[in-house]
Amino acid sequence: MRTAPMLQFPLDEYEQRINNLYSVLEKGGFTAALLTNEDNLRYFCDYRSALWNNEYESPAMLVAVPGRLVLVTSTRTVQTALATCCLDEGDIFAYDGFGEAACPEALAPAIVDTLRKLGAVSGKLGTEIGPVTRMRITYNDRAAIFDALPGLESVDVSMDLLGLRQIKSPREIDVMRQNCRIAVDAFKIAADKVVLGETTEEDFYHNYAAASYDLGADDFSLQLVVEFGPDRMQPNGVAGPRVYSDPDWCIFADSGPTLKGYASDMIRMAKLAPPTAEQQRLMDIVLGCHALVVPMIKPGTTFKEVVEASDNYMREKGADGFCMTIGLLGHGFGQDVHEPPMITLSTEGCFKKGMVFTLEPTLLHPTEGQFAIENNYTVTEDGCELLTPQLQGFYIPERS
């Protein structure tokens, strides 16, 4: 392994991740694994390329066997691999036309040749075919690989890999802590720029994105959800041309930027006028839910316990009829905005040290609109740390 010029973590970070990958292969009895998704390539070797945004091309794939990991890419993009990827040059296999839209016939033979070179011609081939993943490969290419190597059997390895990625290292948590702060600070900057009768939802989005980059973020994995007014209850809707035309309207924003490939996912709310009594009552219900369940969370607390407590609280407050998060209170996140574990009544398992997750109690009131505060947390030795401490409740910009 080598320290590539653009490598984003120290080499020992990737060494540990790759060793964990080898352990998964050995424990599961896998002959090899074929990894095609951007998140996995970035996680295990830091390979990066703008071509991931092109749905018609596959810039690179990883093939792993116990004790060795190789990157398969095109001869035209070897320099990209050498600039970003931690693997030695001898572990970068380049093939003419690999993954290129103009040479679709090149991909499957390149993967077959790589597997043969690594001695992986029979047994279990780990592939990304789990319930929350999919392979970045066409059906025909996948069929061609297994036609050429009939001794291989496709078996899901994605959930094992997501299990590795659930537990963040201290370095990952440091990056996510920084990015989560950027996410909320950018909301404040965008809210401070709202002008009654002029600012649109799209303007807010643009101001938020500009502030995020100015504060140090480097990308977005999802569009920012922006909603003005009580009649715009569109969970995960996109910003539109609506103008902020009533100071009693709420400003609602959801998601956040990324930093070094790691997401943030906050919800914050603002207004240009103080909240009405009913708006404050609804916000207090949301904040009370966080106050109730967060002290419960520590290593060993089950997801079900936390969701049951939240659901019972919403019933006691008479909000269960318009609470969107009954039965589902949050989710893990990392390189993706939504990753396991899902924090639901039906999710087996418990919180573990190093998990990073959101809690987003959300009310969809029929006349008042959408109310939520989504906070980001990480599980510590004996509790959890709030990664988004700023702006709890309504933010009211000061006007001179």
Predicted regions and their residues:
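Active-site neighborhoods and metal-handling regions in enzymes and metal-associated proteins
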Residues: 1-400
